[in-house]
Curated annotation (Swiss-Prot):
Adaptor protein complex 1 (AP-1) is a heterotetramer composed of two large adaptins (gamma- and beta'-type subunits), a medium adaptin (mu-type subunit AP47) and a small adaptin (sigma-type subunit AP19). Interacts (via N-terminus) with kvs-4. Expressed in the cholinergic motor neuron DA9. Belongs to the adaptor complexes medium subunit family. This is AP-1 complex subunit mu-1-I. Keywords: Cell projection, Cytoplasmic vesicle, Golgi apparatus, Membrane, Protein transport, Transport. It comes from Caenorhabditis elegans. Coiled coil: none annotated. The keyword Protein transport applies. InterPro entries: Adaptor_comp_med_subunit (IPR050431), AP2_Mu_C_sf (IPR036168), AP_mu_sigma_su (IPR022775), Clathrin_mu (IPR001392), Clathrin_mu_CS (IPR018240), Longin-like_dom_sf (IPR011012), MHD (IPR028565). One of its GO terms (biological process) is vulval development. Component of the adaptor complexes which link clathrin to receptors in coated vesicles. Clathrin-associated protein complexes are believed to interact with the cytoplasmic tails of membrane proteins, leading to their selection and concentration. Required for many aspects of development and behavior, including negative regulation of vulval differentiation. Required for the dendritic localization of potassium channel kvs-4 in the cholinergic motor neuron DA9. The keyword Transport applies.
Length: 422
């Protein structure tokens, strides 16, 4: 059984440690590992062997890392798996918790161990007692700072004792703001989603709440799911969230403050399909007038509706005598903004509306030298999230066992939402 190379990967498939033993495989082939694994999971296959061209990946998952042996054909998979598990056992003798952070902290020790444990792809010394005679360097262990007793810290300092309500209710809002900059030809140049989970809590006593999100949601560093998974970045929690519980099983468990607060915030860097797309056609007439044809198109599902849509179209600063015609909504010229604003109270999904505008333009040359600011769009879409995040459950646990009503609402709104004009 000859191993060509060894890899330790994080849960996104990124290489943390790599060791090439035989030089007979393409080391970049490991980049295909995570994609192959996702495909197998979608098919329902759980075999610990993946194949890409003439390279086999034999792997195990331990905590939040993958240990992968890359081999050519005709290998004893059982022996390789046994060796990988032995690696975990030996590593734990040096730095106790074998996980992504400790692997990064102890990469020097790991490289020394891999060199001693395997020679030209064949296992050699795997007994930790013997290895410790050769490799005496101590690993860096992950140490959790001891916590002071709850009585000293007043562990629930954010909530008072003795709170009472005649009607027990919880309101939870998932609010996502879409930041986007698109070119005039429809290419999304920059996009991100900035989200927050806001709560209003009116509950008696000292309740514990448990919040579960849908399975497609991943937290940064927590791992990887299928190709349609959503990974939240820059996640920040309110101090009431039990981080130890979250680190263990990703359950968001907390004793909430009374009243309104932000439970968590997050960011999602992804290519966002424009929810409302604006096409513009501009035509100048004999250096004295300019005409705009504006087409607004909603590109979200028909069952959703955007409310209070405002489309702000910039015009030359000296434009005047505006005339507008639109199939829906109202249009107002705002010279202080050097723009006209098209307002549509309700904009259903899958719809397309048209606006034409004619303005006098005393000095066309100045308009050309100014350049054109981007079109800005404001909107709010209830019962909808761009990321696909959903609340799967919100449990309320209180020792008196009272019934409480949880209300969940989703809102997607504009952030910096801009489109350049031709």
């Amino acid at each position: 059984m000859a191993t060509s190379a060894m890899f330790i990967l994080d849960l996104k498939g990124k290489t943390i440690i790599s060791r090439n033993y035989r030089g007979d495989i393409d080391m970049t082939a490991i980049d295909k590992f995570i994609h192959l694994l996702m495909e197998k999971e979608e098919e329902g296959s759980a075999a610990p062997v993946l194949t890409y061209q003439d390279t086999n990946f034999v792997f195990i998952k331990h905590t939040n890392i993958y240990l992968v042996s890359a081999c050519r054909s005709n290998v004893n998979v059982t022996m390789i798996l046994s060796f990988l598990y032995k690696c975990v056992e030996v590593f734990s003798e040096y730095f106790k918790d074998v996980e992504e952070e400790s692997v990064r902290d102890n990469f020097v020790v790991i490289y020394e161990l891999l060199d001693e444990m395997m020679d030209f792809g064949f296992p050699q010394t795997t007994e930790s007692r013997i290895l410790q005679e050769y490799i005496t360097q101590e690993g860096q262990k992950l140490i959790s700072a001891p916590r002071p007793p709850m009585a000293v810290t007043n562990a629930v300092s954010w909530r008072s004792e003795g709170i009472k309500y005649r009607k027990n209710e919880v309101f939870l809002d998932v609010i996502e703001s879409v930041n986007m900059l698109a070119s005039a030809n429809g290419t999304v140049l920059q996009s991100e989603i900035v989200g927050s989970v806001k709560m209003r809590v009116y509950l008696t006593g000292m309740p514990e709440l448990r919040l579960g999100l849908n399975d497609k949601v991943l937290f940064e560093g927590s791992g990887r799911g299928k190709s349609k998974s959503v990974e939240l970045e820059d996640v920040k929690f309110h101090q009431c969230v039990r981080l130890s519980r979250f680190d263990t099983d990703r359950t968001i468990s907390f004793i909430p403050p009374d009243g309104a607060f932000e439970l968590m915030s997050y960011r999602l860097t992804t290519v966002v399909k424009p929810l409302i797309w604006i096409e513009t056609s501009i035509e100048r007439h004999s250096h004295s007038r300019v005409s705009f044809i504006i087409k607004a198109k909603s590109q979200f599902k028909r069952r959703s509706t955007a409310n209070n849509v405002e489309i702000i179209i910039p015009v030359p600063s000296d434009a005047d005598s505006p005339k507008f015609k639109t199939s829906i909504g109202s249009v107002k010229y705002t010279p202080e903004q050097s723009a006209f604003v098209w307002t549509i109270k309700n904009f259903p999904g899958g719809k397309e509306y048209l606006l034409t505008a004619h303005l006098s333009l005393p000095s066309v040359m100045s308009e050309e030298s100014e350049g054109r600011p981007p079109i800005k769009v404001k909107f709010e879409i209830p019962y909808f999230t761009t990321s696909g995040i959903q609340v799967r459950y919100l449990k309320i646990i209180e020792k008196s066992g009272y019934q409480a009503l949880p209300w969940v609402r989703y809102i997607t709104q504009n952030g910096e939402y801009e489109m350049r004009m031709k």
